[in-house]
């Protein structure tokens, strides 16, 4: 425990909190422009072609973001909304694109968990 004299000299340093989505700079979401849309393969036990996009955020930071759901309409220069949230089997992918916002369309014929994928309720 420090003495009062040591506290007068040095003071207490605040705890540094590490953020899991630093590119968002404390915001829940950021807007960005797709610079490249492509597919990658996941880590060892899994096998697929995962859809990802390289996105330049408004602050000028470039991140790799996952495109959730089946099928998408994204291409280069699409304006997207990016949120935090990593994809466990894709190393380096720490962001996800919000479906149904800005240029991204919702998932077609989605029945359950529709709000996560920007899908409207189907007419009976």
UniProtKB/Swiss-Prot annotation:
Coiled coil: none
Pfam families: Ribosom_S12_S23 (PF00164)
Keyword Ribosomal protein: yes
InterPro entries listed in its UniProt record: NA-bd_OB-fold, Ribosomal_uS12, Ribosomal_uS12_bac
Cellular component GO terms, alphabetical: small ribosomal subunit
Keyword list, A-Z: Methylation, Ribonucleoprotein, Ribosomal protein, RNA-binding, rRNA-binding, tRNA-binding
A molecular-function term among this protein's GO annotations: structural constituent of ribosome
Bias type Basic residues, positions: 111-124
Residue ranges, annotated region (Disordered): 104-124
Origin: domain of life: Bacteria
Presence of the UniProt keyword DNA-binding in the record: no
Residues where 3-methylthioaspartic acid is found: 89
GO biological process annotation, one example: translation
PANTHER family, alphabetized: 30S RIBOSOMAL PROTEIN S12 FAMILY MEMBER
Self-association state and partner proteins as the record states: Part of the 30S ribosomal subunit. Contacts proteins S8 and S17. May interact with IF1 in the 30S initiation complex.
Function: With S4 and S5 plays an important role in translational accuracy. Interacts with and stabilizes bases of the 16S rRNA that are involved in tRNA selection in the A site and with the mRNA backbone. Located at the interface of the 30S and 50S subunits, it traverses the body of the 30S subunit contacting proteins on the other side and probably holding the rRNA structure together. The combined cluster of proteins S8, S12 and S17 appears to hold together the shoulder and platform of the 30S subunit.
HAMAP family in alphabetical order: Ribosomal_uS12_B
Family classification: Belongs to the universal ribosomal protein uS12 family.
Protein name according to UniProt: Small ribosomal subunit protein uS12
